[in-house]
């Protein structure tokens, strides 16, 4: 069967402007959250990615009228019906688990296929389940392919998360907004996307305090009305283009950013020696090698984002010494390492830390094992001498809007082929 590949002839200098899109990690939670509304909802600034399309079609399976026009989604839930959600859609998309919290909040029950998405090693949803149980839900996990969750009624509870989890924080919020009484989530995730989802729910009439801190308080309400919401800019997409600009850019401007959201990355790029000028909602970056070696450790927000650990790695081959990247969130998130070795990189990974030495990359055939590994291989391909062919590009399209045409507009020699 023919599949699409991305091909890159490296070594070009890129210049121009990039308009950053809405945050994938917000969008994939806000679309399911629209189920909780009892009237029409408009969501603007959505990224044009396959994950959004999959979620919109899942809403259709619940008899919700949807209209997706570019970056704007209109949702009319007036004739919503509860229905089991099929595996074939759910298994392609990790964030489909937000349908659990949203359907539990709306109907007090749901049957849903088990979530898929990027294979990053163990990412259990035990904290989500712990939260649902605390609110009064019973969970039937007897099937290997789906999960049944139901509650006679949902009652507010104090929930302490054993690990800081964006997914669990948001999912518990979704289930709790219409529960009876107060829910308190302790050790909550503080990511900007958590705040964005809380702001969306508040615009529907939810009573949520403390989003963006480690303690979130939710007072349940009986009804949620319609609203209009603009998704925040994507700090990971912006960060990926910042890494690309630092690798091979000459005066690249990235528009539609929130500087504080990308600060953990800009601090590291400046430590490398990258020339960055940050404005109110944009950044101008140019390559300024040779770079200094740096150590990077991924942490929950406001630390260095795990989703940018892979895209920044190719920059470290341009440093004048040994760099170390330690992954504390998903210690198995090093599937890009073998692919980079195929390109001639001097890199190894052991016990959650990658050791990266100065290297000259050459084009090769490589496989994108997950979304951000794919982004890493694009940065590497732009730096490499010769042609790089990236397979399994469906992962890349899950998180980056029109990345090939965007890079082309900056002067990259990049194209797609059917093979």
Curated annotation (Swiss-Prot):
One family name in Pfam for this protein: EPSP_synthase
UniProt-listed GO biological process terms: cell division; cell wall organization; peptidoglycan biosynthetic process; regulation of cell shape; UDP-N-acetylgalactosamine biosynthetic process
Matching InterPro entries: Enolpyruvate_Tfrase_dom, Enolpyruvate_Tfrase_sf, MurA_subfamily, RNA3'P_cycl/enolpyr_Trfase_a/b, UDP_GlcNAc_COvinyl_MurA
Gene Ontology CC: cytoplasm
Entry's EC annotation: 2.5.1.7
Positions that bind UDP-N-acetyl-alpha-D-glucosamine: 94, 123-127, 307, 329
Pathway per the UniProt entry: Cell wall biogenesis; peptidoglycan biosynthesis
Annotated compartments: Cytoplasm
Annotated positions of the 2-(S-cysteinyl)pyruvic acid O-phosphothioketal modification: 118
Binding site residues for phosphoenolpyruvate: 24-25
Domain of life: Bacteria
Catalytic activity: phosphoenolpyruvate + UDP-N-acetyl-alpha-D-glucosamine = UDP-N-acetyl-3-O-(1-carboxyvinyl)-alpha-D-glucosamine + phosphate
Gene3D superfamilies xrefs: Enolpyruvate transferase domain
Function statement: Cell wall formation. Adds enolpyruvyl to UDP-N-acetylglucosamine.
Family indicated by similarity: Belongs to the EPSP synthase family. MurA subfamily.
Protein name as annotated: UDP-N-acetylglucosamine 1-carboxyvinyltransferase 1
Organism: Staphylococcus saprophyticus subsp. saprophyticus (strain ATCC 15305 / DSM 20229 / NCIMB 8711 / NCTC 7292 / S-41)
